[in-house]
Amino acid sequence: MIYNIYNKVANITLFSLLILFFMSSCSDEMSIKMQYGDRDQLFKQKYEPIPGPRTCFWRRGPVSKDPYINIAYPDAGVFYWNAAFTVPEGAKLYLEGEFPHARYMSLISYDGRGAPIESLADYLIIPNHNSTNPFIDGSKRKNRNRSYKVEIVNLPPEIRRKEGTRIDLKSDIKDSNIDKNNSNSNSLNAAQYGNGQQSIVYRIYVPDKNRNESGGVPLPEVVLVLNNGEELRGEKACDALRSNQAPQISIDAIGLPMTVYSKLLKQPGKPDTWPATVPPTWYLQYDREFLLGIYNGQLPKSFRKSTGGFYPNLDNNYVRTIINRKHGKVFVLKGKLPNTPKTFHGDEFMSKGDMVYWSICSNQGFANTRVNDCLFDEQVPVNNKGEYTIVISRVEDRPRNAFPECGIGWLPMADDGDGAIDEDVTVIQIRNMLSSPEFKHAIQNVSDIGKEKDIMGPYLPFSFYTTTGAFEVLFPCMN
């Protein structure tokens, strides 16, 4: 890295000297005064720190859409923090925190390729004595006493919980006296990988309006109990955990290497719009092989859903399609929105729904893994039947009626497309989080590749390409 910077400086300096020579040879009156420090002026930029809270343990984050750290396909309505650490031999690691004022929170452990190990979702966490878990169906969301304590264990999961679907627990009750004898325990399995590294991601979905990134509460505090009984907190705990260690992840954990991505795009015999089809083709998210299979046709080796992305959330199931602006500058989706809890405006009680959360995102390509923007359920304009129309286009092509005032949602395409090679590529992704067992149209219920529409029905949107003018005349706005 230092070598590259030095070369750039040397090249710029040489370029400046050549200009000096040229100008001096043209006119004796022209001169350039080279002063010490001029080189530094070329590289001066205003320091702008990444917004949002961090701690010595939660060092990496917040990850979200711009201006936050934008990598690994974050949902724009979500904030993520990562911790990489090593629990000393014989020690015990705990996280003490308060439930945030938000739609959802979780702690999820990962391996060195960014594949999830286990999720501990909010509703599975038993609160401390005299505290309330506000994520339990029917709970009061604004109670002040909302603390919890979770142990992080260096073990692989003994039993894999059903993923993506909300489990019906005894704790789904309105009061705070949760049955302490239920099958859930406040622990997360975060097995070591590489040279003893452990990794977890803390997520907060849709903080209540006017709350900060962490949902109006501090980030969970790390507590380390050594094998001699000594308790460490704060910086001392972080030092013992080596929480400043470099991540031991594979090169494709947060995005495909450019060499791999380039080969996927430039396959012999494929059109320059590949793999975008007309009409669009939707793909479930299984493992990494099937993610690449969108381009090369390979099938999944594992049918465990939601593991093939870049640090995916086990509580979500995903479908995605890849679109290409060469097929049309305006992409339209028409579908039906599932019922979800309403929380953004500080609703008093946590309600049930078809699922906990729904969103649709416009993203860049698999090498870039940047999100352009998303709409989550409470942001989507719907008619009295719960149906939506969403437009995806560049800003310059946005129809004048593609605004909430006209009952139309809108998401941007990036001007540089996939952010790497093809300026016309956009990746569209839909999330279904913790669906109810009673809701039969969730992504979670699709078990066969190619049967997405059969199961999801109107909840998998009908979509098509068009032009700005055509959309404006097809969907007149009376406002």
Task: Show where each model-derived region lies.
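A compositional/structural signature for long, glycine/proline-rich flexible linkers
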Residues: I32-N479
